[in-house]
């Protein structure tokens, strides 16, 4: 069957949520009902097609974002199923960067959970329009209306309810469609593939009319024609109402809310309708800003098939059959195999060989891709996550992605000489795939240090190293990735001077060091005027600071959240060089640390604990003993929900302790919140161990 693949018929969406909310289960139903696959893969059976890694099948969780394409009502839908576990947040981040819309899946019992908040904020960051799907409405304790309230309270969003559940918990059978004012009931015998429309149950008519009125009040505000009809008391057609909702979603004025039970095969087809009806096409999104490399001016890139080729690489992975795969989102133009493109970030060319459409880890060769497409390119040599690919005659750079700092590290030692050789190759490939993974060598012990986002993240990396690269290694106990920063502004003058006979080394720098707000990272600025330092030497100053800040003077941890401004300096016509200025910058940094009030920072985790009432006292007492602070407590049915902030250093082994104090009935989830100053007594111990 031929299909119109023009931009208006394309949707690029992500499925995002907290772990265990049902993202992958929802995606599997979407693939089944759209005909992409003829069977339903269940997560709990390790058979979900989108969870193709061995680690995903064993753990029943999504670890890496998986891409696929399906068709619904004449529209092409490119889907990325993202992880819900906090350790793999980077997969959500880079997926949202290239998506036009998203479906946020919520557990109908738990509502808005901590990682739900994290991915929602990430979607806010990239202005991604979204739809809410309240899943698991068949489960005991499911409460649709409380979930809608939590969207307002916790996410600060404006929900637009389009459906109401018919029946509660095990009696959930279908939904009330508030657009058409009818019921939709699913047929169990057909695995939910068939359903029928009917009258709204009499006991729900009043509530349906109440929410229909709320829907109309919000939707008509964006359309004069609809607003006039509404105030005149006249009927508003479904097509006009959908047009109003679509405009509101694209402008992020509100978020449509639907409900269902993906596992019980109810509610997925209307969700697909909503994706097509309300989420934006590539040509609906605002023009993207880019840097014109030739002029250094900011330009706007319009999503157009007829424009010049522009794409962003958002993911790199290794495929054992194909080799290196680079996932790209094409924003403009066309890309054909056997052509050459420019990596504008690296200022190098890449030859395009195979262009692949992906379905999880299955590949389909195509000869051409165009604006709006998400495809994988085989065999690129230099391109990494965040690089821009474009035509040779129009070098431009799209806004790059920001990645979080690792919060945990482990020492990795190969068991044999053969393992040592393979480990270097394995880790270099894994680091290239995952921007949230870091690697360095401890200069004192010679150990390889692997840095990641949490215990599970590092555990999966080590497991992949063993399975995919046949590397056996001894693994050290996880350690907290502390950081250092400064608390005072100070200007340092430093002269680097060295005479060795013949040409010497000379560089003088005046650098103003200033503390920055948490999360700012490192910033460098040059305010050199009048040729005090030739411009070709200034990158040496920045490189010197970048290199030395990786190992602070206080305890040897990276220094973050500060700005260095090069305000003055001097050079020698013969003895100055970029290396001399790099060494001068390092000397200035060493002098600065002792004068700028250096402090040690530790990662603080936001922890949500769900516990039966009778264990709440023990749980709170334990939080206090871990240097934690309770921020909020809520009732949720017969349990208490405790929101706390606890240092990561005190969270090792917490799952075992929590099970012990609650007889296995309490559970928790955590994710990175911020870095905070370490108490003085802890600083002393940490410096001693370093």
Curated annotation (Swiss-Prot):
One of its GO terms (biological process) is ribosome disassembly. Pfam families: EF-G_D2, EFG_C, EFG_III, EFG_IV, GTP_EFTU. GO terms for cellular component: cytoplasm. InterPro entries: EF-G-like_DII, EFG_II, EFG_III, EFG_III/V, EFG_IV, EFG_V, EFG_V-like, G_TR_CS. It is found in: Cytoplasm. Keywords: Cytoplasm, Elongation factor, GTP-binding, Nucleotide-binding, Protein biosynthesis. Residues 8-283 form the tr-type G domain. SMART domains: EFG_C, EFG_IV. Disulfide bonds: none annotated. One of its GO terms (molecular function) is GTP binding. Its main location: cytoplasm. PANTHER family: RIBOSOME-RELEASING FACTOR 2, MITOCHONDRIAL, TRANSLATION ELONGATION FACTOR G-RELATED. Catalyzes the GTP-dependent ribosomal translocation step during translation elongation. During this step, the ribosome changes from the pre-translocational (PRE) to the post-translocational (POST) state as the newly formed A-site-bound peptidyl-tRNA and P-site-bound deacylated tRNA move to the P and E sites, respectively. Catalyzes the coordinated movement of the two tRNA molecules, the mRNA and conformational changes in the ribosome. This is Elongation factor G. The lineage of its organism: Bacteria, Pseudomonadati, Pseudomonadota, Alphaproteobacteria, Rickettsiales. The gene is fusA.
């Amino acid at each position: 069957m031929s299909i119109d693949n023009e931009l208006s018929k394309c949707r690029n969406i992500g499925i995002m949520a907290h772990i265990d909310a049902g993202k992958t289960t929802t995606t599997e139903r979407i693939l089944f009902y759209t005909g992409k696959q003829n069977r339903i893969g269940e997560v709990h059976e390790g058979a979900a097609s989108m969870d193709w890694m061995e680690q995903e099948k064993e753990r029943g969780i999504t670890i890496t974002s998986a891409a696929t394409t399906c068709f619904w009502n004449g529209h092409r839908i490119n889907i990325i199923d993202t992880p819900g576990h906090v350790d793999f947040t980077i997969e959500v981040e880079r997926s949202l960067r290239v998506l036009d819309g998203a479906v946020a899946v919520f557990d109908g019992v738990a509502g808005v959970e901590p990682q739900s908040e994290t991915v929602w904020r990430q979607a806010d960051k990239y202005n991604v329009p979204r739809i809410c799907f309240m899943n698991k409405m068949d489960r005991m304790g499911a409460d649709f209306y409380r979930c809608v309230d939590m969207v307002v309270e916790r996410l600060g969003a404006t929900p637009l309810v389009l459906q109401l559940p018919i029946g509660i918990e095990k009696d959930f059978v279908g939904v009330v469609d508030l657009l058409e004012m009818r019921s939709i009931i699913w047929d169990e015998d057909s695995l939910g593939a068939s359903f029928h429309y009917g009258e709204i149950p009499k006991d729900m008519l009043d509530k349906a009319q109440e929410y229909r009125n709320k829907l109309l009040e919000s939707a008509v505000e964006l359309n004069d024609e609809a607003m006039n009809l509404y105030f005149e008391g006249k009927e508003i057609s479904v097509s006009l109402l959908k047009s109003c909702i679509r405009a509101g979603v694209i402008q992020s004025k509100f978020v449509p809310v639907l409900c269902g039970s993906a596992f019980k095969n109810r509610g997925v087809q209307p969700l697909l309708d909503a994706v097509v009806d309300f989420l934006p096409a590539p040509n609906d999104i605002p023009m993207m800003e880019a840097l014109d490399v030739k002029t250094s001016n900011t330009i706007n890139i319009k999503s157009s098939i007829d424009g010049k080729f522009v794409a962003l690489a958002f993911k790199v992975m290794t495929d054992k059959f194909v080799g290196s795969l680079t996932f790209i989102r094409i924003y403009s133009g066309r890309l054909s195999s056997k052509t050459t493109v420019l990596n504008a970030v690296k200022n190098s060319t890449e030859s395009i060989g195979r262009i692949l459409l992906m379905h999880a880890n299955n590949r389909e060769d195509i000869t051409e891709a165009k604006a709006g497409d998400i495809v994988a390119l085989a065999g690129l040599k230099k391109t990494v996550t965040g690089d821009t690919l474009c035509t040779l005659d129009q070098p431009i750079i799209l806004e790059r992605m920001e990645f979080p700092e690792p919060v945990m590290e482990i020492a990795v030692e190969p068991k044999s000489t053969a393992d040592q050789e393979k480990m270097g190759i394995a880790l270099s490939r894994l680091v290239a795939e995952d921007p949230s993974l870091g690697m360095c060598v401890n200069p004192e012990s010679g150990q390889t240090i692997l840095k990641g986002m949490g215990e599970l993240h590092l555990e999966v990396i080590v497991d992949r190293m063993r399975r995919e690269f046949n590397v056996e290694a001894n693994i050290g106990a996880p350690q907290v990735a502390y950081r250092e920063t400064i608390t005072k502004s100070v200007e340092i003058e430093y002269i680097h001077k060295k005479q060795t006979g013949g040409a010497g080394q000379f560089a003088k720098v005046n650098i103003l060091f200033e503390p920055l707000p948490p999360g700012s990272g490192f910033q460098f600025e040059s305010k050199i005027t009048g040729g005090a330092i030739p411009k070709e030497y200034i990158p040496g100053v920045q490189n010197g600071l970048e290199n030395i800040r990786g190992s602070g003077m206080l305890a040897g941890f990276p220094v973050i959240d500060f700005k260095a401004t090069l305000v003055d300096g001097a050079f020698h016509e013969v003895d100055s060089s970029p290396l001399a200025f790099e060494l001068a910058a390092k000397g200035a940094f060493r002098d600065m640390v002792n004068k700028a009030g250096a402090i040690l920072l530790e990662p603080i985790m936001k922890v949500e604990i769900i516990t039966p009432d009778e264990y709440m006292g023990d749980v709170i007492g334990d939080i206090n003993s871990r240097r934690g602070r309770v921020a909020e407590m809520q009732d949720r049915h017969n349990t208490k929900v405790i929101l706390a902030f606890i240092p990561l250093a005190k969270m090792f082994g917490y799952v075992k302790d929590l099970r012990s104090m609650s007889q296995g009935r309490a559970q928790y989830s955590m994710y990175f919140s911020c870095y905070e100053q370490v108490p003085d007594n802890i600083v002393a111990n940490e410096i001693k161990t370093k």
